[in-house]
């Protein structure tokens, strides 16, 4: 089963509605006393200005701690951020670990914003972004030491193709790091499913998909309580304020934003709503000599061509 043009259009419309513009981000920074032309990456992601993952920047810290238990990326590592959005998670990774990050997203306006924000924060040399489909990536096999995918898989119908591509671009022994919601999705998700495509396998189904693609499951850490607490806090602020604020969700019109938040709160508070961190390792099919990691580049490109 493949993702349809209708799925893509619905997703684009959804994220266009909740994504802040560069001007809106600059205004929020100035209101906080930060010069948007000379800002640090953390001054963006700590205010949730460039993150769309569930739980925002607090969840990024949790993810980094879990990865630190296994194999934290280092300065020589290249990490792929699937569904990078505005690039906040990637800049967080550069800030935290000193690695390099390549981000892909199917929505051009988000890639443009990600590039602009990396330029503003001086991270243009450690981050790069391109428009690409997660199920049809143009990177060589084994190009990345880690693939991060935060609350993105739930929007992709073609799960088998998705995880096959992730396994293909991971080097042997490389890590898949993902955060997502598992199914079956309860009726409380109906308002969200009207807005955007949602396809959530159960946790056993998700593990089978990951392992069937050639990866070995390492751990699953439930995060439902953390995410629910975050959304409850945002809902309170949305009620008390006018609806405008620093996070992407609060840029939605007040009524629409409240309805979407309520759907998530009801879902995560039910027996059917679960979110969690999954780590898996690419099965080592053969040994790889030290220092032989490939730089990510388009298939067919020669070394030294760049990109």
Region locations from a protein language model:
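N-terminal auxiliary segments of SAM/dcSAM-dependent transferases
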Residues: 1-30
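A short acidic, Gly/Pro-enriched loop at the edge of an enzyme's catalytic core
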Residues: 135-147
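Conserved alpha-helix/loop element of class I SAM-dependent methyltransferases that forms part
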Residues: 53-75
């Amino acid at each position: 089963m493949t993702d349809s043009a209708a799925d893509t259009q619905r997703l684009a419309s959804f994220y266009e509605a909740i994504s802040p513009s560069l001007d809106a981000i600059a205004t929020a920074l100035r209101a906080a006393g930060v010069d948007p032309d000379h800002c640090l990456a953390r001054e963006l992601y700590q205010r949730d200005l460039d993150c769309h993952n569930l739980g925002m920047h607090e969840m990024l810290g949790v993810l980094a701690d879990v990865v630190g238990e296994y194999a934290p990326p280092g300065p020589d590592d290249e990490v792929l951020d699937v569904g990078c959005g505005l690039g906040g998670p990637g800049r967080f990774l550069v800030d935290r670990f000193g690695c390099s990050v390549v981000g892909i997203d199917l929505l051009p306006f988000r890639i443009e914003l990600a590039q602009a924000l990396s330029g503003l924060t001086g991270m243009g040399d450690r981050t790069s972004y391109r428009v690409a489909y997660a199920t049809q990536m143009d990177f060589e096999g084994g190009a990345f030491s880690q693939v991060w995918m935060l609350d993105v898989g739930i929007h992709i119908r073609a799960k088998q193709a998705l995880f096959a591509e992730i396994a293909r671009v991971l080097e042997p022994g490389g890590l898949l790091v993902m955060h997502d919601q598992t199914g079956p999705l309860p009726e409380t998700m109906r308002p969200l499913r009207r807005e955007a495509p949602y396809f959530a396998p159960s946790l056993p189904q998700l593990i089978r998909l990951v392992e069937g693609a050639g990866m070995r499951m390492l751990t699953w850490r439930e995060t439902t309580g953390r995410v629910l607490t975050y959304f409850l806090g945002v809902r309170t602020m949305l009620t008390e304020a006018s609806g405008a604020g620093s996070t992407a969700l609060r840029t939605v019109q007040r009524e629409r934003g409240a309805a979407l938040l309520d759907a998530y709160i009801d879902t995560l508070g039910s027996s059917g709503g679960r979110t969690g961190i999954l780590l898996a390792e690419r099965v080592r099919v053969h040994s790889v000599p030290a220092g032989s990691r490939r730089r990510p580049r388009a298939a067919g490109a020669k070394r030294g061509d760049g990109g």
